[in-house]
Each structure stands twice: as C-alpha cells, then as structure tokens.
A protein has these predicted regions:
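Alpha-helical structural context detector biased toward long hydrophobic helices
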Residues: 1-7, 11-307
Length: 307
C-alpha cells in the first residue's frame, strides 16, 4: 500500500482527468513546465504529473501515508461522481438558470479549501512566515511562566530552539484539516456569491488549470494567492475551473457583489469575454507550482506556435 502512495498528487488526478483526453485506460494531458526560465511543453498521463514524491508523509501518526489516504478518501473522491453531476447539470441547463444547490456548494467548497491548504506554497508560507511569528510569541509566553532563575540560565537556549521542518508541516496539516477549522473555512465560501461561468470559447480558448488551480484574487490588486488576499476579505474573488468549459467564481456578500447576490448566486452565466478568460488562464499558469495543464485542441496550437 505504501508504494501505491509514493507519488503523492498535490492536485487530484481525477480533477486533472477532466482537462485531458482519454487514450485507452490512460488520460493524456498537455503540460507546460518552466525550469530555470526555460519553457517546455509535453504530453503525459495524468498519473505522472502534478505530484511530489512522499510530500505528505508524516511521523506523528501510525500511518506515514495518513494524509495521502485522507485526501484520496475525503477530498479526491469528490472529483468523481459528485463533480460529474455538477458539470452535467451546468452543461444541460439553460443560461441564466440556477444550477448550484447547497450540496453542490458544500462539495466544491471542500475541494477548493483542501486544494488551497494542501499545496506546497501554503504549507511553505505557514512554515516560513507565520510559524516564526507564532513560535516567538509561544516562547515568550513560556518564559513568562517559568521561575526567574531558570529563565536567566536557559532563556537563550529556549529562544533559539525550533521545531524541525517536518514537525512544522505536520502542525500545518493537522490544524488546517481539523474538522472544526476545515468546516469553518468551507462555510466562508458557502456563504459567498457563486457565479458559474460557461466558457463560450471552449474550443479555441478553454479554461486552463495547474497543480495550483485555485486562483485567489483581490479586486483592484495585482497580487494573487490566499495569504496575500485573505479568504474572508470582502474584496477577494476565488476562481476555480471545473473543466475546460466550466468555472466557478466566488465573491463575498460583504463586497460589491453583495448588492446583486440574489440575482447571480448559483446562476449559470455565459462567458464570452475572451480577455477575462485569458487573464484567468495566465494567472493560473503563473502561480503553478511546477505544471500547468492545457486542454486540446489549444495544446496542439500552442505547441505548433499557431497561437
């Protein structure tokens, strides 16, 4: 079993399958990778992309593959029939109709929050930026509870002691996916205004995705990312492609979209603005950890230099 979970996907394989092309039992996907400033394009099976070897392995649980099993069971499984049902409903519905139920939002919010929390960028940010701040405060609090004589002798040793990086990563995963915390993050999204975009340019300019597919933007800001914009910020917009032809955008009810929440929440909107589609695609590629994914027929056009 452990061998089966050596190549640990940082984005669900079943999610990537929707952006690829079936080839027998495999699904082939177009890949863009930037290595030391050099851009390379290739095709490969979705089994072989979007993963990091042993990335989620832990030492604080009986099963070192605990998190990979958790993601496969609790999160990635949602990319199967649940996602299929949502996409089918959107595809078969008329424009301007309500296509997302409360259950659909629950499913998608779990996928989005888990994706935001499991990517290396989020884990590394917590380790390198947030953890040092918390660590310093925890040490100060600890020192304040100790006898003065002990502090005088050992203060420098206490303040210089750090948890190993592996422990820090385990701390991040345990905190992010603790049920009460995870449910609270999901509720923030569920309470937002959900707009379902049907891409009218799917055949020539489909939605792209990457191994970091959830785009968190701030209205009026150029920086992207969860920690630069915040999950509950009224100016935050979350954009998530479900397939080459369908994406959801989530806006805060406390922001400017709140005024039209009843009109747009859960509604299918035909998206004909090529500039908007290309902008989202560019940002999703730019924030990729390693791999961006380009559906057909756009992949062949890019590879051949015709676009």
């Amino acid at each position: 079993m452990a061998k089966d979970y050596t190549n640990q996907h940082i984005v669900p394989k079943r999610y990537l399958d929707r952006f690829g092309t079936k080839d027998g039992k495999r699904t082939i996907i177009g890949v863009r990778i930037v290595n030391k400033g050099n851009v390379r394009f290739f095709t490969d099976s979705t089994v072989n992309v979007g993963y990091i070897k042993n990335y989620y392995d832990v030492t604080d649980k009986n099963d070192p593959k605990y998190w990979e099993h958790y993601f496969a069971r609790e999160i990635d499984a949602l990319c199967g029939q649940d996602m299929e049902n949502i996409i089918a409903k959107v595809t078969l519905s008329c424009p301007d109709t309500i296509v997302l139920s409360a259950h659909d939002k629950e499913v998608l919010s779990k996928l989005i929050i888990a994706q935001l929390m499991r990517i290396p960028e989020s884990i590394d940010y917590v380790k390198t930026v947030l953890y040092p701040r918390v660590s310093a405060q925890v040490k100060e609090d600890l020192v304040s509870t100790l006898p003065p004589a002990f502090v005088e002798k050992h203060r420098e040793q206490i303040m210089n002691t750090e948890f190993p990086e592996q422990y820090q990563k385990e701390l991040v995963l345990n905190h992010s996916f603790e049920p009460a915390n995870f449910d609270r993050y999901c509720k923030v999204l569920q309470d937002g205004v959900w707009v379902v975009y049907a891409n009218m340019h799917r055949d020539t300019m489909p939605f792209l995705t990457s191994d970091n597919p959830v785009l968190v933007e701030g209205i009026g800001k150029t920086e992207t990312g969860l920690f630069r914009n915040g999950l509950a910020n009224p100016a935050t917009c979350i954009f998530y492609p479900l397939s080459p032809g369908i994406a959801v955008a989530i806006y805060s009810r406390q922001g400017i979209w709140g005024a039209v929440a009843d009109e747009y929440d859960g509604r299918k909107v035909l998206l004909d603005e090529l500039k908007y589609i290309m902008s989202r695609n560019i940002n999703i590629m730019a924030q990729a950890h390693r791999h961006s994914f380009i559906p057909q027929p756009l992949y062949d056009a890019v590879k051949n230099g015709s676009v």
